[in-house]
Amino acid sequence: MSVTQEFQKANDAYASSFNKGDLPMPPSRHVAVLTCMDARLHPSRFLGLELGDAHVIRNAGGRASDDAIRSLAISQQLLGTNAVVVIHHTDCGMLTFRNEDLRKKLKQELNADAEHIDFLPFKNLEQSVRDDVATIKNSPLLLKNIEVSGFIYDVKSGRLLPVT
């Protein structure tokens, strides 16, 4: 069975008992979470979120990239969120490479020119959280005077550690 077939089978089971079709579009807890796409992270579980509680925006590293800012602006302006939580994590792949490394790999394997792309890797986990919190707080596209907090999720213990 292919992955697509497995997903379709799982969705059939999910949809057969689905009863949340009337949830409102705006998240009930008025919060957006920006975190990493790493498969070891399950933000709904480790934050105690239910369906409809929050916007969860995921990308490589949980970075406050232009696209993440775009999503946060939509979340705030059109759907009423007024808090942002940034969560990076231990043992993140973004700590393992430099832009030059990935650009070279893309050139060698795909003959793709990625010189213009910043993949946003980082060397210091806590500093990356601080940087992304600052990017969000300083973005002209996002609300001022709202709670923007940063955390590190420990993949070994499941604990959230605040970053100040």
Q: What label would you give each PLM region?
A:
Residues 46, 50, 59, 91, ...:
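Short glycine/serine/threonine-biased micro-segments
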Residues 1-28, 62-67, 74-79, 94-164:
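Divalent-metal-activated hydrolytic enzyme cores
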Residues 17-70:
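Conserved beta-strand-loop surface patch within small alpha/beta domains used
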Residues 11, 33, 57, 86, ...:
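Divalent metal-coordination and catalytic microenvironments
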Residues 79-92:
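Ordered, amphipathic secondary-structure segments that act as subunit-interaction surfaces
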Residues 37-39, 90-94:
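Gly/Ser/Thr-rich loops at beta-strand to alpha-helix junctions
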Residues 34-36, 87, 151:
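Short hydrophobic segments within beta-strands
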